[in-house]
Amino acid sequence: MSAATACASPAAARPPLHIPLRSPPSAAHLPSAAASRRASSAACRCTASASASASPSTWDWTRWTRHFADVDQAESYASLLKFQLEEAVDNEDFAEASKLKKAILEATGNDAVAQVMSELKTAIEEQRYQDASRLTKLARTNLVGWWVGYAKDTDDSIGRIVRISPGVGRYVAKSFSPRQLVTASSGTPLFEIFLVRDDDETYTMKVVHMRPTKGTSSASSVSSATAESPAKEENESSLESSAISEGITDEANTDTTLKGDEDVEDKEQDVGNAKDSSVEGLKSVLNFFKSRIPEFKVQVINVDVSEEAELASDSSEELVQDDVKSTSENSLEDSTTEELQQDDVPDGDSDSAEDSKSPEMKLFISGVVHNKEDAGAKSYVRVPAEINNLEKDSFELYIPGKGSDRDLADTKAAKQKVADMAAKLASELMPSDVAKALWGTTKSSSKINKEVQELLKLTLSKARVKLTENTIFNRIITDSNGSDPFSGLYVGAFSPYGPEVVQLRRKFGHWNSTDEVEFFEYVEAVKLTGDLSVPAGQITFRAKIGKGKRLENRGAYPEEFGVIASYKGQGRIAQPGFKNPRWVDGELLVLNGKSTIPHLGGAELGFLYSVPEQSFLVLFDRLKLPE
C-alpha cells in the first residue's frame, strides 16, 4: 500500500477516539503516554509521506478533503492528550505529565499555524520586523482579528461581525451576532483557512466555507411545525409563512433554542430582588417628565439579548415591560410591570381610540437586557471558497456557485416580502405611534400569527451568518483602552428585533454640501450590524462635540438618569428597505453607567430621537471585543 493510500484511511494510523459530547473521558479510557507517542508518531509519518508524494499546491479537492480529516482528528487527539495532562497535573504525577507534554508536541508537530504564530511572536519580541513582515505575507497572519462583512453588489441590510483566530492547522472564522457578543458566546462557524507548509518554506492556503447541513437546523424544525399546523389565520398569513419558510430552510441558526422553566424562575427572582429600587427610580423619572411636559406619557420597550423581545400594548397609556421567549408558550409578564401600570397610569386615559388622536408628547425608551447565551450544536459541510484582494485591512470572500442557488429576481422578491412583513410586525410589537414615526407603518387589521412571527425573527437572525457569493470584509479598528466615550463599539436596540452594534468615531468636517459651510468636530455612529430600516454601513446618528458645543443640562434631566453631558445632533430614520431616509433632530447623552433605573443601568450613551409627537431614546452599552 502506498503512502498516499495509507493517509486516505487515517483511522488505521491512529487509535479511534471516542470522546463523549457532554462529559470528559474517564481515566480508564484515556490512552497512556506511551500509546500516545506511538499514535502521534504514526500520524507524523503518515503526514510526512503524503507531503513528500505531492506538493500541497497541486492537491485536488479529494486530497484536501483527506487533509481536513487528518487535521480534525489531530485536533481531537491533542484535546484528549491535554485533558489527560490536566488530570496528571492534578494528581501531581509530574513524570506522566512530562511524557504527555512530549506526546502533545509530537501530535501537533505539523501544525503550520501554530509554528507560524510562534515564529511571528518571537520575531516581534526580538524586533526582527523584516522577518515578521515576511511571515505575514507568506502565511497571511494578518487575517487574524475582528472583521465586519457586507455582501457585495446586493441589497444586504445585515452586517456580519467575524473573528478570525488561530486554530489547529487552520485559521478559524466565526460569526457573532450582537447577542452572542454581549453574552460572550463561542460564535458560529463561518469559514476556515487551512495552512500547509511546503518543503521550500512557503505556504499553501485552502479556504472553505462552513455550510450548515440541511435537516439539522432549527429552521427546518420550525418550518415543518408551521406547515403541519392547522390554518387558523387568513390565507395571507399562510402565504407569508410559506414565503419565509422557503427563504430560511437551507441555512442554520444557532440562536433558536428553548429556555426551560428554571431560567424563567431565576429571572423572576432577580426581578423581585431589585424591584423596590428600580421601581422607585423609574417613578421619579416619570414624575419629573410629567411635571415639565403637559400630559406626558411614557412607554418602555425591553429588548432581550438572549431571545427576541415582544412589546404588547393594549393602550398607549400603559407602561409595558414584557420579556417574550421564543417558545410556543404565551408571554410572561414581569411583576414589576403590573405595579408600574397600576401606580403610574393617569386616571381616565384608558381609551385607546382617544389616545390615537391625542397630540401629547411621549417618550419611548429602548433598552437591552443581558441574559445568558443558549448554544446549539450544529453540523457543517466544507465547500470550496476563495479569498481575493487581500489587503492589510480588507479582503473579499468568494464562494463559487453561491449566487446560482436562487434566481436573483426571486431573492429580491423574497427580501422585499420580509421587509414588508417586518414593517407590519413592528406595528404589533411596538406601540403603533412609535412604529409609525420610526418605520412609517401603521397597525394592520389582519394580525400576523405566532408561527409567522417566529419565522420572521428566525430569518432576521439567520441573515447574520448567511454568506452571499461575494462578501467584502473590513477590519474593525477600535480604541483599545476605551477611555474616549466617542470612540469604540456600542450595542443598542433600535427595534423589537434585537440589539445592534454601532461604531463611534470622531471626525472633523461638515454635514452639508453648500458653499458656505462651517467646519466643526463631531462624532458619528455607523451601524456595523443593521436592520431592515437603516441597514449596516449607514450612519444612524451624529452630534457636534467640539469646543462650546456641550449643552447646559443642569436640571434638564433627573439625577436618576445619570446624564453627565449632552450634545445637539441628528438621528436618521427610514422606512423598511431604507426608503425615504431622513434626518431628525436629536440629542446625544453621555451617561455615567450607574443608573438604578430599569434599562439604564450600565448604559454609557444614549441618543434621543426627536420625532414629531414622539421622542425615542436608544441606550447603548460599551462593547469590548476580546483580544
UniProtKB/Swiss-Prot annotation:
Q: What are its GO cellular component terms?
A: chloroplast; thylakoid membrane
Which cellular compartments is it found in?
Answer: Plastid, Chloroplast
**Which residues lie in Acidic residues bias regions?**
308-321, 331-353
Q: Where is this region: Disordered?
A: 1-34, 212-277, 308-359
Q: Which GO terms describe its biological process?
A: response to singlet oxygen; singlet oxygen-mediated programmed cell death
> Bias regions of kind Low complexity — which residues?
217-229
Keyword Plastid listed? The answer is yes
Q: Major location, coarse class?
A: plastid
The reply to whether Transit peptide figures as a keyword in the UniProt entry is yes
**What keywords does the record list, in alphabetical order?**
Chloroplast, Plastid, Stress response, Transit peptide
Where in the sequence is the transit peptide found?
1-45
Q: Write down the InterPro entries for this protein, in alphabetical order.
A: EX1/2
Q: Function, please?
A: Together with EX1, enables higher plants to perceive singlet oxygen as a stress signal in plastid that activates a genetically determined nuclear stress response program which triggers a programmed cell death (PCD). This transfer of singlet oxygen-induced stress-related signals from the plastid to the nucleus that triggers genetically controlled PCD pathway is unique to photosynthetic eukaryotes and operates under mild stress conditions, impeding photosystem II (PSII) without causing photooxidative damage of the plant.
Name of the protein this chain belongs to: Protein EXECUTER 2, chloroplastic
Q: Which organism is it from?
A: Oryza sativa subsp. japonica
Read off the lineage from the record.
Eukaryota, Viridiplantae, Streptophyta, Embryophyta, Tracheophyta
